[in-house]
Amino acid sequence: MANDLVQARDNSQVFGVARIYASFNDTFVHVTDLSGKETIARVTGGMKVKADRDESSPYAAMLAAQDVAAKCKEVGITAVHVKIRATGGTRTKTPGPGGQAALRALARSGLRIGRIEDVTPVPSDSTRKKGGRRGRRL
């Protein structure tokens, strides 16, 4: 009986929360504790590449996620719940190109993935959309 409890403790995971914000300009990978109060690691795509146009690329997001995963393992976090977010509001509600890549990189780096949740802010009745009455004219 006691051996079963010890094995259960050995198999238990230490969870954090990975918040991935993927816009079309940049990708943030931010890991906190479960309460969200303490930041464990935060890396952006812009910190990993030199060219501004590459900040939101899947490659930059992958590098950022690998960096975050390494820091998490140092601290002792073995699993993460993922909250992925797009710009939202009156802007686009689909995550940018780096979102999927960051999630895959977290999974492949050895962190266990718990729940995956989309937390993009969706307005119930929003402010007026940018662009004026006749829209954006090209």
Swiss-Prot record:
Subcellular location: Cytoplasm; Nucleus, Nucleolus
GO BP of this protein: cytoplasmic translation; maturation of SSU-rRNA; maturation of SSU-rRNA from tricistronic rRNA transcript (SSU-rRNA, 5.8S rRNA, LSU-rRNA); ribosomal small subunit assembly; translation
GO CC, any one term: cytosol
InterPro entries found in the cross-reference section: Ribosomal_uS11, Ribosomal_uS11_CS, Ribosomal_uS11_sf
Record's keyword terms, sorted: Cytoplasm, Nucleus, Ribonucleoprotein, Ribosomal protein, Ribosome biogenesis, rRNA processing
Ribosomal protein found in the keyword field: yes
Region (Disordered): 118-138
Start-end of Basic residues biased regions: 129-138
GO MF annotations, alphabetized: RNA binding; small ribosomal subunit rRNA binding; structural constituent of ribosome
Protein family according to the UniProt entry: Belongs to the universal ribosomal protein uS11 family.
Assembly, per entry: Component of the small ribosomal subunit (SSU). Mature yeast ribosomes consist of a small (40S) and a large (60S) subunit. The 40S small subunit contains 1 molecule of ribosomal RNA (18S rRNA) and 33 different proteins (encoded by 57 genes). The large 60S subunit contains 3 rRNA molecules (25S, 5.8S and 5S rRNA) and 46 different proteins (encoded by 81 genes). uS11 interacts with eS1 forming part of the mRNA exit tunnel. uS11 interacts with snoRNA U3. uS11 interacts with MPP10. Component of the ribosomal small subunit (SSU) processome composed of at least 40 protein subunits and snoRNA U3.
Further remarks about this protein from its record: Present with 3370 molecules/cell in log phase SD medium. There are 2 genes for uS11 in yeast.
Function statement: Component of the ribosome, a large ribonucleoprotein complex responsible for the synthesis of proteins in the cell. The small ribosomal subunit (SSU) binds messenger RNAs (mRNAs) and translates the encoded message by selecting cognate aminoacyl-transfer RNA (tRNA) molecules. The large subunit (LSU) contains the ribosomal catalytic site termed the peptidyl transferase center (PTC), which catalyzes the formation of peptide bonds, thereby polymerizing the amino acids delivered by tRNAs into a polypeptide chain.
Protein name: Small ribosomal subunit protein uS11B
Biological source species: Saccharomyces cerevisiae (strain ATCC 204508 / S288c) (Baker's yeast)
Name of the gene: RPS14B
